[in-house]
Amino acid sequence: MTWLLHQNVVFLALLAGLFTWGCTIVGSAIVFFFKNISRKLLDIMMGFAAGVMIAASFWSLLDPSLTYATQNGYGKWSWFPAAAGFLLGGVALRLIDAVVPHLHLGNDISKAEGIQPRKKKLSKTALLFLAITIHNFPEGFAVGVTFGALAGGNMTLAGLMGAIGLAIGIGLQNVPEGAALSIPIRADGKSRIKAFYWGSMSAIVEPIGAVMGAALVMWMMAIIPYALAFAAGAMIFVVTEELIPESQTNGNTDVTTLGLMVGFVVMMVMDVALG
């Protein structure tokens, strides 16, 4: 652990991003053992992922944003960076959602969203891949921002453990997300190798987002409270626009909600225990 305290935060963010990507790869590998899984189990997994993201948004992002602003001279305006960043994060994801072509899990290809290419329509597999990729980037960015914030005089064991806790939480919820993409692709007729490939590659943006997030806050330390809240807003948009609705459309509302609550508690306990 002492070795980690002396490393560049961008390098640490890269390692964390590679870890979360690796967790997606593990989840995608489920396709080698099952061609299909019950919709109820898939919904529970999505609920768990939503719970982790909601808890991470508050405990690991919004709360530190408010604390940082309070400790750095914002006074009675300490709420402003968190509020502004949170809203900007949601708006940014809405714009991406409106532009990038994608398809939510369980939907027919006719319900694809975003701007479709005129010359060649994207396949269902590609659209599902883009849907997962859209919300994997803010997860990686969130991890990167938490590590980048350590450069602002916060490179303590507690601060480092808090950032690691977020990475572990994101990694945990990436396992069901990987399965949630690879299994439907396999069920749609693709080979196990192709389903695994698409599922795994959907999170390649996470180490990229992690490096970008860490580098950005290192370059402009003043935006740390805004960046933390921005990542939280982006993640909450994904949860409310995609994860929760998708998990609630098949009549499994009770168990899905319980899955969400378990995910929330797991992430909350990890953040408090490690941070």
Protein language model features and the residues they cover:
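Intrinsically disordered, metal-sensing/regulatory segments
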Residues: 1-275
